[in-house]
Swiss-Prot record:
This is Porphobilinogen deaminase. Monomer. One of its GO terms (molecular function) is hydroxymethylbilane synthase activity. It comes from Thermus thermophilus (strain ATCC 27634 / DSM 579 / HB8). Its cofactor is dipyrromethane.
Length: 301
């Protein structure tokens, strides 16, 4: 029996995601043995959240050195360009991409009183929350999901904003008070999606992964990530994007670029054929840059 090693971070969420993937792989390839190997990343060791690839670099290095054969990532953690020698082999069916609100007393973001404290780990969420509710106080909230839920329970925050997908994958959907409307708070490009990464030229690993590939999810995140790449903003700027694929093959993409304080933002949308997902993302980025996005990025830098 052939053995395939699947690498992942060691957090509860990363392991839940990877176990889900491995179970699907086992169903499709029962003659193959899949082993999970956890890898500690710089992000797990407290690296600055303003660095790129802090949750993936060590896993990618293990892939390149052949310690593992497949890497399972949260797609939003991946830089928009793959390292030399690696490729994304598969994007499985995407989980809910939206952000969600969990409150201490208030059960909706709009019901929080002025001056209430909201916790989030993301400059994108912070900027969009402040754009909606400039009367709120938004503070950093980091750590794993359990740590963030404990901070809410301890009364350190009046509410917190997280990704829906993580809570759902951890069977914590019942903790969600409100799904935030993407018309007001756009998620991160690729949020809710997983990426299965392999070495270029490893046809076996690529074939194994491709069995889980979900083309509509792939086209959606491809457009969103192209928008991010076209802005040249990196994965840590206040950028949101969300694409939808209609039954007739039309892809609709909406994107936003904000200043960190949420006082200025440019939001735009585009649509076209799903086969042009990447071009649509790049075109939308050019549109946002021409509408004043360059000035916003200059402020951020």
């Amino acid at each position: 029996m052939r053995v395939v090693v699947v690498g992942t971070r060691g957090s509860a969420l990363a392991l839940a995601q990877t176990r889900f993937v491995v179970e699907r792989l086992k169903e499709t390839w029962p003659e193959t043995e899949f082993k999970i190997r956890t890898i500690k990343t710089r992000g797990d060791q407290g690296a600055s959240p303003r660095e790129e690839a802090i949750f993936v670099k060590e896993i990618q290095e293990a892939l390149l050195s052949r310690e593992i054969d497949i890497a399972v990532h949260s797609l939003k953690d991946l830089p928009t360009e793959s390292p030399r020698g690696l490729k994304i082999a598969s994007v499985p069916r995407r989980q809910d991409p939206r952000d969600v609100f969990l409150g201490k007393a208030a059960k909706r973001l709009k019901d929080l009183p002025p001056g209430a404290v909201v916790g989030t780990s993301s400059v994108r969420r912070k900027a969009q929350i402040l754009a909606l509710r400039p009367d709120l106080v938004v503070r950093d909230l980091r750590g794993n999901v359990d740590t963030r839920l404990a901070a809410l329970g301890n009364g350190e925050y009046d509410g917190i904003v997280l990704a829906a997908a993580g809570l759902i994958r951890l069977d914590l959907r019942n903790r969600i008070d409100e799904f935030l409307d993407p018309g007001e708070v756009l998620p991160a490009p690729g949020q809710g999606a997983l990426a299965l990464e392999v070495r270029e030229g490893d046809d076996l690993a690529e074939e194994l992964c491709y069995a889980l590939h979900h083309p509509p999810s792939y086209h959606r995140v491809r457009a969103e990530r192209a928008f991010l790449r076209g802005l040249g903003a990196g994965c840590l700027a206040p950028v949101g994007a969300l694409a939808h694929v209609e039954e007739d093959g039309t892809l609709r993409l909406e994107g936003v670029l904000l200043t960190p304080d949420g006082k200025s933002f440019i939001r735009a949308e585009i649509e076209g054929d799903v086969s042009e997902a990447e071009e649509l993302g790049l075109d939308l980025a050019r549109d946002v840059l021409e509408q004043g996005g360059r000035e916003i990025l200059a402020q951020i830098r």
